[in-house]
Each structure stands twice: as structure tokens, then as C-alpha cells.
Amino acid sequence: MYKLMKRIYLLLSLLLCSLLCMSQVSTSQNYISTRTYTSPDQSGCREQVVYFDGLGRPSQTVDCGITPDRKDLVSLQEYDDQGRKLRTWLPAKSAGNGNYMPLSSLQSGASSLAGGDVRPYLQTTYEASPLNRPVAQHGVGEAWVEHPVSYQYITRDPRSFSWLYYKIPSGNFLGVCTTDEDGNPAYE
């Protein structure tokens, strides 16, 4: 009888411990919470919570209590259908509790923090190939829609470059022509 009671108590205590552990984990979103202590006596710390989508990619980053009025700063990362970074949003303020912020609230908060701009995000366009190389990157704000940074992937052509010291056969050298917002090209 004593052994049976001991086993029942053990099973009940394990059940209670598992329930306590489950109550500490968010049931709606996956996240990793990080604390960085800023003083040796652990009196001050910075806390950051990174929420992940269903595929394990970071979707929201919450810097807890980082604004002057002790509110959270939340950043959003959106992905396209192929898992590439599509839009990186400017941060928005939230209530200050480190919780996940709904997408619509975050988008309107980022827009209001950016002075009402309708494009408070950086947007990247990729080429339609399995290499997933970016071809254009539009800066934050409506003013930069017509002035993207563009990337052109080129191979060596005997007519396009003069090579003084190197003998490279045509088509063997891959380079990138980056055109900035003002239309100035730079070759890499």
C-alpha cells in the first residue's frame, strides 16, 4: 500500500510540474526571450522577444521597454511565397508588455510613427530564378518608390570592360553592377 501511494504522489507531482511548465509557454506563437544584463548586480537588463512563424523564421522582434516612455518597440519581417525576405517594416510602439502584436496594429503603428507614410517598410524584389538574387531594393518611404537600388548580374564581355593585367575568357567572370538611388553605377 505504501509503494502504491508513493507512485500516485510521484505521478501527481509530475503531472503538476508539466502543467506549470506548459503555462509559461505561449500557446499561440513560438518565441525566444533573451535578457541581456547591463550591470554586474543584475539590477538592469534589456529584454528582447523574437516571435517566429510556423516555418521557424523570425516574424516579429520586440525590444521590451526600450522607448523613453517605457513602451516596447516592435519590428516586423514579412516573407514572400518562396521564403525570401520581402518587407522589413520600421518599428512601431506597443503597450509595453512584450506580447505579440497583431499585423494590422503593427502596420498602422509603423505608418503613424513614420509621419503617416504609406510605405514604412524596405521592400526587396528578387529575380525569377533558383538563385534568389535581389534585383531591386526600394527604400523606406513613398519618396523612394521611383528610386530603387538595383542590381544587375553580369559576366565578362570583351566589349564592356578593359582588363589591363588579367586575361579572363569571356563569360567566366561574374560581376554585379549596383545602381544607387541617384542612378550611379558601381561595379563589383
For each predicted feature, which ranges?
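Positively charged n-region of N-terminal signal peptides that target proteins for export
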Residues: 1-8
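Acidic, low-complexity segments
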Residues: 8-10, 22-188
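Short, linear, compositionally biased motifs with a strong N-terminal bias
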Residues: 14-15
